[in-house]
C-alpha cells in the first residue's frame, strides 16, 4: 500500500480514470478531489479517530474514503453511481474496514447505525443536492457527532451567516436551528478534476448541546420563509403578503412586532432565531393564527 500513490493524488486519479475509461458525470455533479492536503484537512477537521464509524456520502473513486479508512474504525460509503462500485471495490480492496453501498443516501436505512456510539458523517457532495441531503440528515434518526461536508463556497457562507449580513436568510436560520456551523477551510476549484466553475469550502455541523425543539416548529419556519420572501420589504409588509392585506391583520402584525421589541420598519434579516420564536408566540397570542 505504501508504494502505491494515494488514490487522491493527481497521478493516481488520472490512472484510474484512464484505466476504467471513466468520465465525471455532469448529471450527478461529479468532480474528483485531487488535493491530498485538502483530503487530510477533511479527516483532521472531522477529528476522525480509531473509535469512529464514518458514513461517507459520494465516495467517487475512493480518494477521501482511503484517508478516512486509515483513521477510522469503520467507513460505510454510500455511492449512487452504479458504474463506480466495481472501481471502488478495486481501489479500496486493501482496506478491510470499508463497506461500499450502492444506494441513494436519501433512501438509506439508518437503523443499522442505531448502536454506534461514535458516528460521524463526511461528504463531498454534488452542489445541486447539498441542501436536500443536509436537511435529510438533520431530520433523520442518526445520532451523529458531526457532519463534515465539502460544498459550494457561497452555500457555506449562507449556512454560517449571522443576522444582518447579506448571506443571512431562511437557509441560515433553518440550519442553525439545530446545529452549530463552522467553515473549516476554503478550497479552490483547482483542487478538483475536472475543475468546477465555483470555489468550495469544508463546513462542519455539530449538534447543539441540550437542543430542544421549538414547540411550534412548523409555524416558526412558515413565518421565517414569509419574512424573507421579499428581502427589501419590511417585516410588516412581508407578513401582510402572507396573512392577507387588511386592517385587522396589519394591527395584529404591528402589535406582535412591537411586543417583540422592534421598530415597525424592521426587515426580516434583522431578527435572530430567538426573535422569530418570540414573534411566533406574539402572533399567536394576538390571534392572527394558531400555532398548532
Swiss-Prot record:
Principal location class: cytoplasm
Alphabetized UniProt keyword annotations: Cytoplasm, Methyltransferase, RNA-binding, rRNA processing, S-adenosyl-L-methionine, Transferase
Cell cycle found in the keyword field: no
Keyword Cytoplasm included in the entry's annotation: yes
SMART domains given in the database record: rADc (SM00650)
Cell location: Cytoplasm
InterPro entries linked to this entry: KsgA/Erm, rRNA_Ade_diMease-like_C, rRNA_Ade_Mease_Trfase_CS, rRNA_Ade_methylase_Trfase_N, rRNA_adenine_dimethylase, SAM-dependent_MTases_sf
A GO molecular function held by the record: RNA binding
Transmembrane segments annotated in the record for this chain: none
GO CC aspect terms: cytosol
EC id: 2.1.1.182
Chain residues that bind S-adenosyl-L-methionine: 31, 33, 58, 79, 104, 124
Reaction catalyzed: adenosine(1518)/adenosine(1519) in 16S rRNA + 4 S-adenosyl-L-methionine = N(6)-dimethyladenosine(1518)/N(6)-dimethyladenosine(1519) in 16S rRNA + 4 S-adenosyl-L-homocysteine + 4 H(+)
Function per UniProt: Specifically dimethylates two adjacent adenosines (A1518 and A1519) in the loop of a conserved hairpin near the 3'-end of 16S rRNA in the 30S particle. May play a critical role in biogenesis of 30S subunits.
Homology family: Belongs to the class I-like SAM-binding methyltransferase superfamily. rRNA adenine N(6)-methyltransferase family. RsmA subfamily.
PANTHER family given in the database record: DIMETHYLADENOSINE TRANSFERASE, DIMETHYLADENOSINE TRANSFERASE-RELATED
Family matches, as NCBIfam families: ksgA
Protein's recorded name: Ribosomal RNA small subunit methyltransferase A
Amino acid at each position: 500500500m505504501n508504494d502505491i500513490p494515494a488514490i487522491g493524488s493527481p497521478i493516481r486519479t488520472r490512472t484510474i480514470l484512464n484505466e476504467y475509461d471513466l468520465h465525471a458525470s455532469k448529471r450527478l455533479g461529479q468532480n474528483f478531489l485531487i488535493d491530498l492536503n485538502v483530503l487530510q484537512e477533511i479527516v483532521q477537521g472531522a477529528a476522525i479517530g480509531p473509535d469512529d464509524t464514518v458514513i461517507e456520502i459520494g465516495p467517487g473513486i475512493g480518494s477521501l474514503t482511503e484517508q478516512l479508512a486509515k483513521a477510522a474504525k469503520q467507513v460505510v460509503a454510500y455511492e449512487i453511481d452504479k458504474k463506480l462500485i466495481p472501481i471502488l471495490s478495486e481501489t479500496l480492496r486493501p482496506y478491510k474496514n470499508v463497506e461500499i453501498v450502492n444506494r441513494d443516501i436519501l433512501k438509506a436505512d439508518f437503523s443499522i447505525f442505531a448502536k454506534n456510539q461514535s458516528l460521524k458523517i463526511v461528504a463531498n457532495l454534488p452542489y445541486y443536492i447539498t441542501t436536500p441531503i443536509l436537511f435529510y440528515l438533520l431530520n433523520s434518526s442518526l445520532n451523529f457527532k458531526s457532519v463534515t461536508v465539502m460544498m459550494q463556497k457561497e452555500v457555506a457562507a449562507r449556512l454560517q451567516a449571522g443576522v444582518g449580513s447579506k448571506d443571512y436568510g431562511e437557509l441560515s436560520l433553518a440550519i442553525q436551528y439545530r446545529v452549530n456551523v463552522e467553515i473549516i477551510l476554503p478550497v479552490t476549484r483547482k483542487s478538483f478534476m475536472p475543475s468546477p466553475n465555483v470555489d468550495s469550502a469544508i463546513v462542519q455541523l455539530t449538534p447543539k448541546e441540550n437542543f430542544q425543539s421549538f414547540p411550534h416548529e412548523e409555524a416558526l419556519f412558515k413565518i421565517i420563509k414569509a419574512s424573507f420572501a421579499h428581502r427589501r420589504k419590511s417585516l410588516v409588509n412581508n407578513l401582510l403578503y402572507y396573512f392577507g392585506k387588511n386592517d385587522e391583520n396589519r394591527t395584529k402584525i404591528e402589535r406582535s412586532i412591537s411586543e417583540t421589541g422592534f421598530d415597525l420598519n424592521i426587515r426580516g434579516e434583522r431578527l435572530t432565531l430567538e426573535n422569530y420564536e418570540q414573534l411566533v408566540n406574539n402572533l399567536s397570542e394576538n390571534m392572527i393564527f394558531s400555532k398548532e
